[in-house]
Amino acid sequence: MNKIKNYIGLAMISLSFGQIQAQEEPVNGLDTVRFSNNIIPEVTDAVKIPFHPQLHNVTDSIKIEEYHVPKYPFKFEYLPKKFKPLAFKKSREKALNTNLIKLGLGVPLVYDIEAYYSSDRSKDLVFGAYVDHYHLNGGTANRSVRTSDISLFGKKIFNKDIIEANISFGNYLHEFIDPDSLVAGRFGSTIPNVQNHVRAAGRIYNYKYEEDEIRYDLYGNLNYSTSSMYNANGINGHGGAIVSNQLGTGMLFIDLSNELILLNNESSSLTNITTLKTYYDLEGKDWKVRLGIMAALDQNAPLILPEFYSEKILVEKYLTTYSGWKGNIEGRDLERMLFINPYWDIASVELTNSYNNIKYAGFKGAHDSKLSYDVRFERNDVKNNLLFVTSEDSMHKFESLYEDMSVTSSILSLGYQLNDKFNSVLENRFYLYNMASSTETQAWHMPNYAITWLNHYNIQDLIEVDLSILFQGETYNRVGDTEYINDGFVDASLGIDYHYHKNLSIYLDINNILGTRYNIWYNYPTVGLNVIGGVKFSF
């Protein structure tokens, strides 16, 4: 299969941690999606969206030959919905033909329409389109949500080089609660906010090379987003290059980024980041070491960030220890901020980049190719960490804060796989927060623990069953000087996919089985039990 199809297929594979399919607002990473972008041959990238957007996630089981490109500067994900997984399994994607039409209908009133087409009639030219429209009519109590996306893509293969291009258009509707319409604490009418976006991206890289030749990857993109409620416009662009040499096992990475927000047609906030990163790998029979450094200019202020990783095999396959230290910059832009919190009060817009300084250590291993484990401890000293508190002017909007803090995490991951028919992953994350200043007493809206359990069962390639359960601890919110607690919750989802024919599938997704209307953001309870089902045609 052509590489562009692999991108699409991998972007469509996701595991739902419960209340995702008919979520009223983006749940900010409750859905974990893994993308695999081929940067250059033998050098791969595996980006994992963290469970909570404000918690930095050190990539699991780092391999020395992997290079982890920042997920935001380089956008070839083809992800039309940021918060709702598709009932589309990896094993099924291999069996399906290239083209797909999906129709779904559910309760409460929700419909989903998706279509994907790709042409590869020529060996050196691939082009296609992806269309998606999802609408949940929740009424005034539940607040409607709507997403629409159209993506056009193409790839041209030359003698040694590949050129890829993508352009997408879309919008996302979410609704604020109108505080003036509240009666006796009950939900009243809503205020719609439509976010539009246009994205364009291009990339050229060499896929054939001699052993001593330089490998390269040049990329760039431009994103434009708007918010109707605030008459806000955000423009950001990225450009960069990756250069490496197979003999040196080193890599040079350069990235330029810029973000401008216009509020009421006036320049409101501007950020720019320039990064230059290089590393070198050393490897022995039972050990690996990576030494690297990143130099950056953030708003023209210089910054030096380290990268170090070491790995030592103590017992072949069963026990490997590792440790590392790395720093990075987390940039801000309008679209990303509204994705993290769609109820953010843009009127008080301020973009401030965050700096992560992460030290971690752990051990991992496997047994009989079925059971694997990873135990990791990490500490992240964050400068300008992004937090949200309820606005005193409106109980249904949030102000952004930037606070220095440290996050100490302990992570236990267990995985079990039986052939290709059954796999189960259990991940436990526990967090301790230490605020650097006495002004803010809590890490607002950040959980103290998160436990996810994901299960997939393939029954004779005829029926596929997915069960996912999420346990999240309580979070805190502040309104003025008063603190409030968002209770912890349990959320479970069940998905069934019946392959009636090689070109026809019937699916059913039952989300939030327990029907709990919990709060991801204060004063915004989620939808309860919801069901969506439909058919998928391939041709």
Set out the residue ranges of the language-model regions.
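Residues that define the transmembrane beta-barrel architecture of outer-membrane proteins
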Residues: 95-97, 109-111, 144-150, 192-200, ...
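Residues on the lipid-exposed face of transmembrane beta-strands in outer-membrane beta-barrel proteins
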Residues: 115-119, 129, 152-156, 200-206, ...
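Outer-membrane beta-barrel translocator/receptor signature
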Residues: 81-85, 92-101, 105-150, 161
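C-terminal beta-barrel architecture of Gram-negative outer-membrane proteins
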Residues: 430-437, 445-499
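Outer-membrane beta-barrel translocator/channel fold
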Residues: 137-207, 256-272, 292-307, 315-372, ...
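Repeated loop/turn-to-beta-strand initiation elements of outer-membrane beta-barrel proteins
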Residues: 124-127, 160-165, 209-216, 247-254, ...
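Outer-membrane beta-barrel "beta-signal"
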Residues: 65, 69-72, 503-507, 526-539
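Outer membrane beta-barrel strand-and-loop segments of large Gram-negative receptors
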Residues: 348-352, 363, 374-427, 438-440, ...
